């Protein structure tokens, strides 16, 4: 679909500048002003990872599911990892998305509140997600084939990296994953291998420059950027990976 002249001009204006984490977080938090959230069927849980309790918000498709004593036994579950450049966004900002996902699919949605950069560099957020996934996939009341791993943007990166890590460690293995415009690359420079970066990296709001800013916020070092758990596109062996959409 073509972009009209007025829209293109607005996008160009909004594309200027880099990432200000605090401003970006404040803008993202505006999504919390959702009058429908009082109707969402949800509950909060935590998973302990050794030095931190990772928060999870669980969304149910209906009232009956929310009130059941065994809320995960025999259920189909979507393990959701939100986007936001590893540095902005929270589960609370995705409540409408998660609630609608639960209602539309009839499945339970478990959204992970992983820790954010730059306060918590790679691999902290990834390990939070891995900890929750391991607890869910190895729980005696769940079956791996009933769980779908799903993430958007930075969450797609975390989902892809999590699956590679799960294969490497052998503790559990996702059977299927949905990667929604996943940020799996580590190079958004003018020399990028991808024409999409070179030709469309400017003037379209989320620019190549802003993506570089997000990567620098997430990475603890230059060496991190070469780690396939940081940029899954670098993984040379994709055997043993889940069915992927």
Please name every model-derived segment.
Residues 2-47:
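An N-terminal hydrophobic leader/cap segment in hydrolases
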Residues 1-2, 119:
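Broad phosphate/nucleotide-binding scaffolds in NTP-utilizing and phosphate-metabolizing enzymes
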Residues 32, 41-46, 52-245:
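Alpha/beta-hydrolase superfamily serine-hydrolase fold, recognizing
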């Amino acid at each position: 679909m073509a972009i009209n002249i007025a829209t293109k001009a607005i996008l160009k204006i909004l594309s200027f500048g880099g990432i200000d984490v605090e401003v970006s977080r404040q803008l993202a938090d505006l999504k919390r002003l959702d009058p429908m959230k009082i109707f969402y069927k949800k509950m909060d849980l935590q998973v302990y990872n050794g030095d931190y309790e990772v928060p999870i918000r669980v969304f149910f498709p209906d009232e009956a599911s929310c009130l059941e004593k065994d809320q995960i036994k025999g259920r189909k579950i979507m393990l959701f990892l939100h986007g936001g450049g590893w540095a902005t966004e929270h589960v609370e900002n995705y409540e409408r998305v998660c609630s609608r996902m639960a209602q539309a699919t009839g499945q339970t949605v478990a959204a992970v509140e992983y820790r954010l950069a730059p306060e918590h560099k790679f691999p902290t957020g990834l390990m939070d997600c891995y900890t929750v996934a391991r607890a869910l996939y190895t729980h005696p009341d769940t079956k791996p084939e009933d769980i779908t791993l799903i993430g958007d943007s930075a969450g797609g990166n975390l989902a892809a990296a999590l699956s590679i890590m799960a294969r490497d460690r052998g503790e559990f293995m996702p059977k299927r994953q949905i990667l929604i415009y996943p940020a799996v690359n580590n190079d958004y420079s003018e020399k990028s291998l991808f024409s999409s970066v070179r030709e469309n990296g400017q003037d379209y709001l989320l620019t190549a420059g802003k993506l570089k800013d997000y990567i620098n916020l997430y990475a603890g070092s230059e060496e991190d950027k070469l780690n396939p758990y940081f940029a899954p596109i670098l993984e040379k062996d994709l055997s043993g990976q889940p069915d992927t959409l």
